[in-house]
Amino acid sequence: MLWLFYSSAIIASVILDFVGIIMSLFITVVNYKTWVKSHRISSSERILFSLGITRFFMLALFLVNTIYFVSSNKERSVYLSAFFVLCFMFLDSSSLWFVTLLNSLYCVKITNFQHSVFLLLKRNISPKIPRLLPACVLISAFTTCLYITLSQASPFPELVTKRNNTSFNISEGILSLVVSFVLSSSLQFIINVTSASLLIYSLRRHIRKMQKNATGFWNPQTEAHVGAMKLMIYFLILYIPYSVATLVQYLPFYAGMDMGTKSICLIFATLYSPGHSVLIIITHPKLKTTAKKILCFKK
């Protein structure tokens, strides 16, 4: 029964992954066309373009890896497994840093805090985006290289995977994976949760203030603020379980967990990327309008 549940979780993760690939490609193409057409692109659209490309390759790699894992009758070498792990770690870390940068940009630009740090960031963050994007990639490359360096000290044993008798022996080298993951993810988690929480608090305060004034309450600016607040709330709902599930997957005792727990972790870990991409589309005016045109929902 648990194997059936786990198989269903794998099928669900493949479907979600496929949806995420389509959504990421859509975000990339729309922002690229905007860039080519107007010969300029905003800071947020530049981040979305980078995020779309990174997520597309990350989810495509995950899909190929899953299909190969399920369909292969042959034993799987440790080198191929290590290649998939390293590429996925780099792409996943890059996409998370892009999301962190996007949330920070939204927080700084939309909130109206008068603290000197916020005012300084508000003036300087947009011009720095072209430099911060490569910095995100370099940080991801550094954490991946750190993983490789640490894994050389305690190398992975031979990893053999069979179709009908799956066996992962990763007791050695797991510490290096956990260390590199925590170094990268903990800072991302703190920045994302802080940015989202500050933005939600600021927008709620702004909306309540406008409700009290009751003059021209619902205008395009307020609608954009409400959309940003919804995006942050739903982002936290997806991101926090994803972070917990991903961390659990990298811990040594994960291999000994029952299939039910593994299935839940797999679903939460897979749901985040496509779910967040869908949220971006339905809360971004230009992406939402283009999606409606494609789906023939425009009145």
From Swiss-Prot:
Q: Which residues lie on this side of the membrane: Extracellular?
A: 1-9, 68-81, 153-172, 252-262
**Stretches that traverse the bilayer:** 10-30, 47-67, 82-102, 132-152, 173-193, 231-251, 263-283
Q: Where in the cell is it found?
A: Membrane; Cell projection, Cilium membrane
Q: InterPro entries, alphabetically?
A: TAS2R (IPR007960), TAS2R4 (IPR030055)
Q: What is its main location?
A: membrane
GO terms (molecular function) for this protein are: bitter taste receptor activity; G protein-coupled receptor activity
Name the domain of life: Eukaryota
Per the record, membrane topology reads: Multi-pass membrane protein
- Which residues get glycosylated? N164, N165, N169
Instruction: Tell me more from the record.
Output: Several bitter taste receptors are expressed in a single taste receptor cell.
What is the role of the protein in this entry? Gustducin-coupled receptor implicated in the perception of bitter compounds in the oral cavity and the gastrointestinal tract. Signals through PLCB2 and the calcium-regulated cation channel TRPM5. In airway epithelial cells, binding of denatonium increases the intracellular calcium ion concentration and stimulates ciliary beat frequency.
Which PANTHER family does UniProt cross-reference here? TASTE RECEPTOR TYPE 2 (PTHR11394), TASTE RECEPTOR TYPE 2 MEMBER 4 (PTHR11394:SF55)
How is this protein named in the record? Taste receptor type 2 member 4
Record organism: Papio hamadryas (Hamadryas baboon)
The lineage is: Eukaryota, Metazoa, Chordata, Craniata, Vertebrata
